[in-house]
Amino acid sequence: MECKVHYFYVLLCKDSTFYGGYTTDLARRLNEHNQGIGAKYTKLAKRRPLQMIHAESFATRSEAQKAEYAFKQLTRRQKETYLRTHPSVTLPNGQ
C-alpha cells in the first residue's frame, strides 16, 4: 500500500484574498488553479495568477481536510497570524 502525503495549502490570489485547499500533489494543484480548472473560487480571472504561500503535510486525508476547514473559519486577521506562526513545507514555486 502506497503511503501518500496529504497537504493543506494556502494560495494568495491576485486580488489579495486567501484560498485554502487540500491535495496530495502541490505542484499539480497549483498548476490546475492557475489554468482555471481548480476550485470555483479560483476560476475567476481577477483572482489569477495564484501563488502558493503555505503548505502543511499530514499523514491522513482527514487531518489535512480538518486543517483546511479550520483555516476557512478564520477571519482575515486570524489567517494572517496563522500563516506567520505555522511552519510550511517547501513549496512548488520555491518559497
Question: What residues fall within each predicted segment?
Answer:
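A short linear hydrophobic-aromatic micro-motif
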Residues: K40-K43
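GIY-YIG nuclease catalytic motif and its immediate N-terminal context
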Residues: M1-G38, R48-F58, S62-K72, R76-R77, ...
